[in-house]
Amino acid sequence: MERIKELRDLMSQSRTREILTKTTVDHMAIIKKYTSGRQEKNPALRMKWMMAMKYPITADKRIMEMIPERNEQGQTLWSKTNDAGSDRVMVSPLAVTWWNRNGPTTSTVHYPKVYKTYFEKVERLKHGTFGPVHFRNQVKIRRRVDINPGHADLSAKEAQDVIMEVVFPNEVGARILTSESQLTITKEKKEELQDCKIAPLMVAYMLERELVRKTRFLPVAGGTSSVYIEVLHLTQGTCWEQMYTPGGEVKNDDVDQSLIIAARNIVRRATVSADPLASLLEMCHSTQIGGIRMVDILRQNPTEEQAVDICKAAMGLRISSSFSFGGFTFKRTSGSSVKKEEEVLTGNLQTLKIRVHEGYEEFTMVGRRATAILRKATRRLIQLIVSGRDEQSIAEAIIVAMVFSQEDCMIKAVRGDLNFVNRANQRLNPMHQLLRHFQKDAKVLFQSWGIEPIDNVMGMIGILPDMTPSTEMSLRGVRVSKMGVDEYSSTERVVVSIDRFLRVRDQRGNVLLSPEEVSETQGTEKLTITYSSSMMWEINGPESVLVNTYQWIIRNWETVKIQWSQDPTMLYNKMEFEPFQSLVPKAARGQYSGFVRTLFQQMRDVLGTFDTVQIIKLLPFAAAPPEQSRMQFSSLTVNVRGSGMRILVRGNSPVFNYNKATKRLTVLGKDAGALREDPDEGTAGVESAVLRGFLILGKEDKRYGPALSINELSNLAKGEKANVLIGQGDVVLVMKRKRDSSILTDSQTATKRIRMAIN
């Protein structure tokens, strides 16, 4: 206070003011500070005093021809004096105003194309809705977020090649445009930017914004998709938040969201198949998201989510080194441990074999709605500091940490038997057994954990076994904090391996991910996901399985027909018939299969009983392991639309309806495709069925005697040739194969050769 008073007194004297405003600064140190180096030391001040001058701007001499010396008000726009040290002209700020109003205009057609991301942002903000402001403590945690809405997902190198090709097509330098997205974007941009007058460097910079994902590590409470991050400064402060609904969506957020849904569906489906890893890869390779191959998206998209990372690991891509447990991402921040197998007894005296982590370790735990810091020793929780959005989220984090600690009191808190199974009906591993048990009900766990008195520490409070806050007592070692725990910021990726049950391990053998960690949350994808794999037919329910199965048979009828006559077992084992089995009542599967297989065998043996439509209709039923029985059926039941519906063995039904006139099949009223059969439908199938073991050599050859009927063929010796009468009175030359085993590829040509021989 004294000093301020003294200064006030000084300033009231006119001499002081004169010294401060008029005296030159001639102290060498000060002059040095402000004049050494090219870097401006006080840009704001410099700008202020420059703009106070009459001519603060320099311009090329050509400006004198383009701008009048004075404006309409008679103010001078440029000075005839040269800028010291260059041959440029000194110009007034008023010249800029004149130029903006009266200067030359250019075509603006390219602006929305080049500055696309800005124009789109304006649209999103225009149509967005801002809600009320709430004042409350904000638990923000730093997360790696996408700050650039509306981008493609090219790598920096790929984008660089595209930009060079679009903006500087004549520059020297090897550019290899390989990926589909690179080629599409290049073509599109070249067309859009023809005759563009905007500075190439600006175009290049804007293209980069459009092509590459930019991420930052920012404190966020709430939505993390890029359309929320672009308004982060408007929606959350230190003690307030403003509700906001974006006025539009962007492709990159939609891709991220749809990728997660597709990956979860695929992992869930793969888990229940005979070879999960092979199935997962088959599905990833045959799935498209928004018209782009899922494997291409996986290679480029940095989204970290359990199911997505399992798919990446299966493709041999690197993933983050953090591991997942109970839906939380764990990252070890210090300490180390060795793993030992140990047998423990639950409160129900059930023996569990668990892999115990021996040693002191510290972890950060990050989930969607809660975060925590965990310090633990061998089978002991030392400290857990947790923060979350609400009581429920905090409880979830505490349960996961307690189970992860492997403490004895947690294992003893188990009541009843642990027999949780996964989707494939296999028992879960012991740690996940415990987790599921306590996620269902953690009362006993919290009650038997123990409580302790707590010190008063700023920003921390205790939490009681019933999950209510307290300032006096808390669950042993557990505290609730107002501050969130930041997500692990590193973008480092490590090489991992994956086994056939989709367990992902790092190079030390630690399990980072397993299908148990994949969220069961269902969502609706923003982009169309097209699963071409038969394994995904059931995702849309029983009807979809039925329609897809029959569509598949019709699409592949040529091959199916030959296999049906030559190698039925191989046909019955096709994975495309797997989903169908879930529609057939369990008790009837074997009987139906036995019945249909017998029927098919009769068709193969007895001439003229071949019936294309009937084979198509009954084929899926033959895929189950058959039971030998004498049972006959006039209709077969399938479970769709919540009840059993009948497929008639002979004739049409609402489930399976074949229209002879249009040759189209409808399944449950949905079109399942058209049969492309020969005009004499049925006979071509018979020929290839009956001519099994014979090679069709061509047209009739009189040297081999008169035409035999198909029935007389059986008398030929191996290697012997004969003319044979088929179908509508046509004659072809055949030879009996020298080997008994009929080869599939030979017979695939049978039908074609009959046609060629006849024509």
UniProtKB/Swiss-Prot annotation:
KW Transmembrane (keyword) present: no
InterPro entries, A to Z: Flu_PB2_2nd, Flu_PB2_6th, Flu_PB2_C, Flu_PB2_CAP-bd, Flu_PB2_middle, Flu_PB2_N, INV_PB2, PB2_helical
GO biological process assignments: 7-methylguanosine mRNA capping; cap snatching; DNA-templated transcription; symbiont-mediated suppression of host gene expression; symbiont-mediated suppression of host mRNA transcription via inhibition of RNA polymerase II activity; viral RNA genome replication
GO MF annotation list: RNA binding; RNA-directed RNA polymerase activity
Motif Nuclear localization signal boundaries: 736-739
GO CC terms of this entry: host cell nucleus; virion component
Residues carrying the site annotation Avian adaptation: 627
Domain of life: Viruses
Chief place of localization: virion
Keyword list, A-Z: Cap snatching, Eukaryotic host gene expression shutoff by virus, Eukaryotic host transcription shutoff by virus, Host gene expression shutoff by virus, Host nucleus, Host-virus interaction, Inhibition of host RNA polymerase II by virus, mRNA capping, mRNA processing, Viral transcription, Virion
Protein location: Virion; Host nucleus
Family: Belongs to the influenza viruses PB2 family.
Quaternary structure (record): Influenza RNA polymerase is composed of three subunits: PB1, PB2 and PA. Interacts (via N-terminus) with PB1 (via C-terminus). Interacts with nucleoprotein NP (via N-terminus).
Biological role stated in the UniProt entry: Plays an essential role in transcription initiation and cap-stealing mechanism, in which cellular capped pre-mRNAs are used to generate primers for viral transcription. Recognizes and binds the 7-methylguanosine-containing cap of the target pre-RNA which is subsequently cleaved after 10-13 nucleotides by the viral protein PA. Plays a role in the initiation of the viral genome replication and modulates the activity of the ribonucleoprotein (RNP) complex.
Protein name as catalogued: Polymerase basic protein 2
Species this protein is from: Influenza A virus (strain A/Grey teal/Australia/2/1979 H4N4)
Biological classification of the source: Viruses, Riboviria, Orthornavirae, Negarnaviricota, Polyploviricotina
Gene: PB2
